[in-house]
Structures are given as C-alpha cells and as structure tokens.
C-alpha cells in the first residue's frame, strides 16, 4: 500500500516515481519535510488553491525530491508539467507533493527552488533543488518560465 499525505486530493493518483508505459516502481513513503496546504490568504494570487510548504529548514543546494508523474511527449503536455530533454512529466492526474509547488510570480521576487534533470541508469529524473535557504513554514516556489505565462 502506498502511503500518501493525509490531505492528498482524491481525484489525483499519488505516485512518487515516473509512470512510463504503464509500469511503476512505487516507493511506499512520502517526501519528508513538506506539507500540502490550502492557500487561505485572500490577498494571494493563488488564494483557494494549494501550495507546498516546508515543515523543516532546507539549505541551499538541498534536494527536496523527485518530481513524478506520467512521462509524455512535449506535444501532449498539460499544465502540471516538468520538461526533460525530449519528454515531459505530467502530474495533472498522478504525481507527488511536488506538483503543488507554485510559481513565484506575484508571490515572491525570486523562487527558492529550481528544476534540475539528473540521470539514474541513463533515465532522466527531474529534481527540485533549493536555490536559497527555506525556513520552516515558508512556501516552496519555483519559476515556471516565461513560456508558461505566454
């Protein structure tokens, strides 16, 4: 049985590895040090949506975790997408806690994480890496890139 966060949305399958051609190698734990939280600040651009928040301090260069979802072509990519070299990882219908990382635009002057692609056994893995210290309780943010907003 896969252990998922207690407040995980019921309409999204929780996975913490990529789904590729129907095969999954599912680990049975959640990403540590983070919590999904509904944004309750009415002044926030993402009010009423979800965000990912630190439950511990993260230092610059820490790896928060691997972004997971279904491997798809760039052509079929949706809105919850991280890009690799020739493919994308779409977490719209399945993924892990990292799918709730919001863009820093209109929230913070700069993101506190970035996406980095690394290779394990010649397979790409999309990782979220801390770019500046994140304090406990702080929202985890990244830049979706200019093309997302065009």
Task: Name each model-derived stretch.
Residues 4, 8-112:
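Catalytic cores of histone-lysine modification enzymes
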Residues 2-10, 105-150:
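C-terminal SET catalytic tail plus cysteine-rich post-SET Zn-binding segment of SAM-dependent SET-domain
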């Amino acid at each position: 049985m896969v252990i998922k966060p207690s407040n995980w949305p019921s309409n999204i399958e929780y996975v913490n590895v990529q789904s590729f051609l129907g095969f999954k190698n599912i680990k049975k734990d959640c990403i540590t040090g983070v919590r999904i939280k509904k944004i309750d600040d009415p002044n926030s651009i993402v009010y009423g949506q979800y965000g990912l928040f630190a439950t511990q301090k993260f230092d610059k260069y820490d790896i928060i975790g691997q972004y997971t979802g279904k491997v798809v072509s760039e052509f079929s990519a949706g809105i919850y997408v991280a890009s690799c070299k020739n493919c994308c990882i779409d977490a719209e219908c399945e993924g892990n806690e990292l799918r709730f990382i919001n863009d820093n635009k209109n929230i913070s002057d700069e993101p506190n994480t970035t996406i980095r692609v690394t290779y394990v056994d010649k397979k790409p893995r999309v990782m979220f890496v801390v770019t500046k210290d994140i304090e406990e309780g702080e929202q985890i943010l990244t830049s979706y890139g200019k093309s997302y907003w065009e």
